[in-house]
Structures are given as structure tokens and as C-alpha cells.
Amino acid sequence: LRAVRFAAQLGFSIEKGTLDAIRRSARRAENLSGERIKAELEKILLSPRPELAGELLRLGLLAHLGGSPDCPGLLALREEPPEPVPRWRAFCRLTGFPIAALPVEWALRRGVLHPEAEAVRALALSGGELAALGLEGPAIGAAQRRLAAHILSHPEDNTPARLLALARAELSGP
């Protein structure tokens, strides 16, 4: 785990002989605590080369936890903000890695499994601004959830002006 982390953080390549040795002893990773695996994997995900997290799967170091060793497209991890929730969410989505297999904090698990909750907090429009449109109580929360679902698919729309326009259009009906 650490060899891959050092490669991700420090920008070097792991020699073929070292990779072969890691592959041969990969089953020993089953003896590592979930906390240790989570810590090392998260450091890789937050590094300048987060795509190397896929090496842990390809080398068999996470075979006992799940996830696909065939995980192309991990360069997309670099496009995510270098923060735990977005990087974990993308890693799990791209590899099928089960976040529930590791002892992770409740907030991280919730952010990965329920991205809409984080999207509500990230809205560029406040509940007060929705209240100014005439919404009250639970209707504000419902509108925030609908707008959050929208920005998950269309992040470019997360501006106050665009969200206000969407909320107004929804209020005026079809």
C-alpha cells in the first residue's frame, strides 16, 4: 500500500521487480486493519496522482474487499476537487469499490452513498432566497433537494441566477 502511496505522492514509478513482489504477497493485505487501508487509500486519492489508487486493485491488495481490478478511466479522479468525499465517490463509482467495506466516518460514507445531501449544501442558492419566492418550511427543503439533484447532472447550473430561474419555472408550473 505504501509503495503505491509514495509513487502517487512523490511522482515516481515502482520498479517491475517491486510490483511483482507486491503482487505475490498481496493476500497479506487481508491482515491489515480497515483503518490502515482506508488511511493509505485516502492519501492516494488526495495525492497529485489519484489514479494510482487503481493499482491497489490491479495488484490484488484490495481483492478481499471488492472492486474491479479492470478500472480504466481513473484519470478522471484528477478532475475532482482534492477533497475526500468527491474523490472517494468517484473512485467507488469508477471501480465498484464498496465504501461500506472500510471503517469510514459517517460523513464520508454519507457523502459517497448519498451525494444529493452534499449537493444541497453546495447549492449557490440559500433557503432564504427560496423563501423569498414564497416557499415555506418543508417546501424549501423539497425545492433544495430537487435543485441539488439537478446540479448533480448539470453542475454548470449551480449559479444563483440559474437556480432562481429553475425554482421560478418550477413554481409557475408546466
Positions of predicted regions on the chain:
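Glycine- and charge-enriched loop/helix tracts that form the active or gating conduit
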Residues: 1-84, 122, 138-144, 148-151, ...
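C-terminal structural cap/anchor segments
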Residues: 81-113
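C-terminal accessory/binding modules appended to enzymatic or scaffolding proteins
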Residues: 112-146
